[in-house]
Structures are given as C-alpha cells and as structure tokens.
Design a protein with these regions (language model features):
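Bacterial Sec-dependent N-terminal signal peptides
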Residues: 1-12
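Mature catalytic domains of secreted/periplasmic carbohydrate-active enzymes
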Residues: 10-404
C-alpha cells in the first residue's frame, strides 16, 4: 500500500472471459461484504509500520537480521480466525509477501522466508489456511509486485536506500520468481479466494508488467480465485474486482483515486482500523466501533465491500483494542447483518444523512446522521410499507411523485 503517489497505465488487446466458477465467486464476494486485512511480517518487530525499510533507508543486509529474532510465540491461527469471525467478517486477506521481500510462507523460491530464515520455523499461511477452511471463512493473499530487497527487481520509485547496486534489475528473472511463488500459493494452500496485488505504481507508466500472462496463470491454477490490483486505476483485462485504497468508490479524499473510474466489477474499499497498515507501537489512534460500522455501511451503500485492516503484533497476537473493536462490530452485525450481507447499493443515492442498500424488493435505509425530525427520501418506486428494522414498528410516510 502506498505512502506516496505515482501513475501507472497498462493497456490490453486481450478480451478476458471469466469462467462460470469465477462469476459465481464474484457474486459470493459481493455477498460477503466484509473482510479483515492483516499486514504482518518481520517489519512488525520494528513496531514502526510496513514501510520502515524504505522510509528509514535500512540496508537490506541489516534489515534481514530482523528475521533471526522473529519468533511470534503467541501466534494461534484458531484464535485469530475466531476473533475475526466474531466481527462478522466473511474473509481474511493476509500479506504473503510485502515490499520488503520477506515471504510469510514456506517458499522454495527464496530462503528469505518465515520457515528458513527465522527460529519460528512454522508456515503461518499454512496454519491460517487450514484454520480458515475449518472455521468456514475464505482466505485471500496479498502479494507485492515491487521488491526493495532483490537484485532482480528493476529499480523503481522506492527502495533506493536499501543497499542494492545502482541500475540493478533483471525483469525476466524477477517475473519468473513471482509466478513461481504465485504457483506455490495457489497449489499448496487450498482454495484461495483472491490474490490482492499491490505495488505496480512503483514503475513508470510505460513499464510492461506482463499482467495478462500472470493473471492467466492464476485463473488456470484456480479459476474461482479472484484477482484485484491496487494500481489506483480503472481495472485492466483479467481483473475480477476493483479496489479503492482508503476511499469509498467515487471519492478521492486520500488522493489515490484521481484516475480511477467505477467499473461494473465487484468493488472493495480498504481502510485501517487505526492509522497504519503494519503494527506501529505508538499508533493508538483507533477509529471507534461506531466509525468502523459507519464506514462499512457507507461502503455497502456504494455497492462495495469493506476490507478493514489490523496490524498484528510481533509476538503473534492481534492488538487488544483491535480484538475488542471486532467484538463491537460483530454485535452490530448480529443485529443488522441482514441489511448488509447479500445486498447491493440501494436505489437511493448516498446522502449526508446516510445510505441505502437493497435485497430483492426490500430497500434498507441506513440513517447515520439525521439532522431533522423528518426525512425526505428521493425514490420513484412505490412504497408498500415502511418499518423500523429491529422492532418492526410501522413508520408513517407520505408517498409523493419523486419520493417519500
């Protein structure tokens, strides 16, 4: 995920036709509406976030020493999945390999991984994948296109102070490395709900990432695996959902979505529970449960999923505040989940007072900030009845030509 901005464009002459399995997976993805993002790696030991290697120009040889001390003794996949399910989330997306190149799984393509380079010696992605299947929640993998560590990744806009030789890069080698790792992830870890790409904004606009071939490989290995790419542009051929970083669709408050239209693909917005993606010890600026719920509702009202991020601690635990917030969001979802799960953006466009979602012939009006005693809802459809969702108490309304 980005700490700065740059542009990237990729064109395609190919026509991507998704398989029936993929179409079904897209619908399930839209129905699920809510996921939890986990940014976890050896950078958590710095307690300064996932960009620490780049922002502090840490030499890669020194940075690699973090691995020898990484021993998350309190990691328990069952506890993680259970806590996340409590929130009402239907899927988990975890960093398999971030920009620092450290792989959080047992890869044969690099010894810079959690099994070979740490005293922990456990494949946490394998444990998490098995637990997700056991508890009935989907697992997605974040995968970085850029790399601050390897010599074969071509020099880009970031990672200049990590000690790699000037003018380094061997694209053919790096591309082969990525595809072999993706093959491992899609072969050894059971059903994968999605691959969540990030980082192609690191290269110039004319850089050829060979996405078509890479996407085709993923769809060949697992046809129902969805592909999304955090390039901050309108989706390219081969992608199955569109993502928005720290923004609701159609907005550009974070500054990443200026060149991004809204496609017909399923939509997802990602946001942090506090301020950072990776664990940062002094970042206690958590959004309140109410703020998180409102963001989830607003995303649903804009026909999008919410992928809400937590940065696990270096000892393997989820932060206590995050766990408590998951519980509070879950309490709300237990009551109002029917108005979120399986819905699409409603017929009433988002307003300052709230949003709407719909399911069949039912329209759910989510009033988040009512300023007056009465509310005018612009709606051309004829309303048969209006009730308060929980109590089922009938609500009085007046049908007019263009609304109620």
């Amino acid at each position: 995920l980005m700490a700065g901005t740059s542009a990237f464009a990729q064109t395609s002459n190919q026509i991507y036709t998704p398989t029936p399995e993929n179409i079904k997976a897209r619908q399930e993805f839209q129905d699920n509406k809510f996921g939890i993002f986990l940014h976890w790696g050896i950078y958590s030991m710095t307690a300064q976030g996932e960009w620490y290697m780049n922002t502090h120009n840490i030499n890669r040889n020194e940075y690699a020493k973090l691995a020898s001390g990484f021993y998350p003794s309190r990691f328990d996949a069952a506890e993680w999945v259970s806590a996340i399910k409590t929130s009402g989330a239907k899927y988990i997306c975890i960093t398999s390999r971030h920009h620092d190149s450290f792989s959080m799984f047992d890869t044969k393509e690099s010894d810079f991984n959690i099994v070979d380079a740490t005293p922990f010696k456990r494949d946490i992605l394998k444990e998490l994948a098995e637990e997700c299947q056991k508890q009935g929640i989907k697992l997605h993998f974040y995968y970085s296109h850029l790399d601050w560590f390897r010599d074969d990744y071509p020099e880009g806009n970031t990672g200049h102070g990590t000690g790699r030789p000037k003018g380094h890069g061997n694209w053919a080698s790096y591309y082969k490395f990525m595809n072999k790792q993706l093959t491992e992830l899609l072969t050894n870890y059971g059903p994968v709900g999605a691959i969540w790409f990030d980082g192609i904004w690191d290269q110039p606009t004319n850089f050829n990432w060979q996405l078509e071939e890479q996407y085709a490989l993923i769809h060949k290995l697992q046809p129902s695996c969805l592909i999304g790419n955090n390039h901050h542009r309108t989706p390219y051929a081969g992608e199955d959902f569109q993502m928005f970083e720290r923004d609701l669709p159609g907005e550009n408050k974070a500054g990443f979505s200026a060149g991004q239209g809204i496609s017909e693909l399923p939509l997802e917005t990602c946001e942090t529970m506090n301020g950072m993606w990776g664990y940062r010890i002094e970042d206690q600026n958590y959004k309140s449960p109410k703020e998180l719920i409102h963001y989830l509702v607003k995303a649903a009202g804009k026909n999008a999923n919410l992928l809400m991020n937590i940065g696990p601690q270096p000892n393997g635990e989820l932060p206590a505040t995050a766990v408590e917030h998951l519980k509070q969001v879950g309490k709300w979802m237990n009551q109002y989940g029917e108005t979120i799960y399986g819905t699409r953006g409603g017929d009433v466009v988002p307003h300052t007072w709230g949003v709407s979602t719909r399911k069949g012939d039912r329209l759910f009006i989510h009033i988040l900030d009512l300023q007056d005693d009465a509310l005018y809802i612009p709606l051309k459809a004829k309303v048969k009845k209006a009730i308060q969702f929980i109590s089922k108490t009938p609500l009085s309304f007046k049908q007019e030509k263009d609304g109620i």
